[in-house]
């Protein structure tokens, strides 16, 4: 059994931070010490962990002393601010933000896809974007059998992707609309209840938003396949938690549907959900709180002989963020890569 290590959660009070806390407990992660770090306004408060109330500390230059591992989920600016302090303290940072994902020397890791990449870290390992992780876990089993040439993906992203306050905003907007009031938007740019809109991340020079470009660039890096052609359209939808994606794949030659179903059903981190007679396939409601990515509606693309279509749903706070980070941490401990 691996030796227990000293862990800090940076951003412990956020949606991903609290999920990290739950996962470390439920997966019996080998902890020698657990330190909860957040902004000064949360300092002095407590969070429960395995029956104990742990104090939250304000992050400062000495906060990482003695830590072996830091699970960072406080946003890109915070990760950049403290990365040097963390690595100087001798700890490894598993970072959930986008700050370091495309830095060439920083591994971008999904344990079901490229676990060996974690071995080459220089003190920082990046956790991919939620939509990238969910799609990657679902389609990598097919890529292993026959390299994917092109991916066309449309996402249906829940409010929780914008944080806990966005979820509350959608609830309030729903009540307002049902009571005949005009819904107000403060966290998201527009009312999301009974509505949807293209993802609200900044638009880039090529007219794709940043969220869409993350899917393109990160998938290529994780798959170590710069030649995959990828296009994405990301949409925010009025669902509280769990993202969904419609994915079209193109291969060099026809890919048998039954082979695809078998490969996905056997793959780690994925669950095949299909009942064609009942028209029952993955739904965000079913994926919420689940570790596995739910995949279904696998079918031949009638517009292309070498194409497949599939539908997936996954909890972006768990596998799309916190669970993937904990799995990376487990990998580092089990293989002695800290």
Swiss-Prot record:
GO aspect biological process, one term: lysine biosynthetic process via diaminopimelate
Enzyme nomenclature, EC number: 1.2.1.11
Pathway terms, separated by semicolons: Amino-acid biosynthesis; L-lysine biosynthesis via DAP pathway; (S)-tetrahydrodipicolinate from L-aspartate: step 2/4; Amino-acid biosynthesis; L-methionine biosynthesis via de novo pathway; L-homoserine from L-aspartate: step 2/3; Amino-acid biosynthesis; L-threonine biosynthesis; L-threonine from L-aspartate: step 2/5
Binding site for substrate: 157, 236
Family matches, as Pfam families: Semialdhyde_dh (PF01118), Semialdhyde_dhC (PF02774)
Entry keyword set: Amino-acid biosynthesis, Diaminopimelate biosynthesis, Lysine biosynthesis, Methionine biosynthesis, NADP, Oxidoreductase, Threonine biosynthesis
NCBIfam families named in the record: asd_B, PRK14874.1
Subunit annotation: Homodimer.
Annotated family: Belongs to the aspartate-semialdehyde dehydrogenase family.
Name recorded for this polypeptide: Aspartate-semialdehyde dehydrogenase
The organism of origin for this protein: Synechocystis sp. (strain ATCC 27184 / PCC 6803 / Kazusa)
């Amino acid at each position: 059994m691996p030796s227990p290590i000293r862990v800090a959660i940076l951003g412990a009070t956020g949606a991903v931070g609290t999920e990290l806390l739950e996962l470390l407990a439920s997966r019996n992660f080998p902890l020698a010490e657990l330190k909860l770090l957040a902004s000064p306004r949360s300092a002095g408060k407590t969070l429960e962990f395995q029956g104990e109330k742990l104090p939250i500390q304000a992050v400062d230059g000495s906060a990482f002393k003695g830590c072996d591992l830091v699970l960072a989920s406080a946003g890109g600016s915070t990760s950049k601010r403290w990365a040097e302090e963390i690595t100087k303290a001798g700890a490894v940072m598993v970072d959930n933000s986008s700050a370091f994902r495309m830095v060439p020397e920083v591994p971008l890791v999904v344990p079901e896809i490229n676990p060996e990449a974690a071995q080459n870290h220089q003190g920082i390992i990046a956790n991919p974007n939620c939509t990238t992780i969910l799609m990657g876990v679902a389609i990598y089993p097919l890529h292993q059998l026959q390299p994917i040439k092109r991916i066309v993906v449309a996402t249906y992203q829940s409010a929780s992707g914008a944080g806990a306050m966005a979820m509350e905003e959608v609830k309030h907007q729903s009540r307002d609309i049902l009571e005949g009031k005009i819904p107000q938007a403060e966290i998201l740019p527009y009312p999301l209840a009974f509505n949807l809109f293209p993802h609200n991340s900044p638009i880039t020079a090529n007219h794709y938003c940043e969220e869409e470009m993350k899917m393109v660039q990160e998938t290529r890096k994780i798959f170590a396949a710069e030649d995959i052609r990828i296009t994405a359209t990301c949409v925010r939808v009025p669902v509280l938690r769990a993202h969904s994606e419609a994915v079209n794949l193109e291969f060099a030659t026809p890919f048998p549907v039954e082979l695809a179903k078998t490969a996905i059903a056997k793959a780690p981190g994925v669950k095949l959900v299909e009942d064609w007679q009942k028209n029952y396939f993955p739904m965000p409601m079913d994926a919420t709180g689940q570790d596995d990515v739910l995949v279904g509606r696998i079918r031949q693309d009638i517009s292309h002989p070498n194409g497949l279509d599939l539908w997936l749903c996954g909890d972006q706070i768990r596998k799309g963020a916190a669970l993937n980070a904990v799995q990376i941490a487990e990998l580092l401990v089990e293989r002695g890569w800290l």
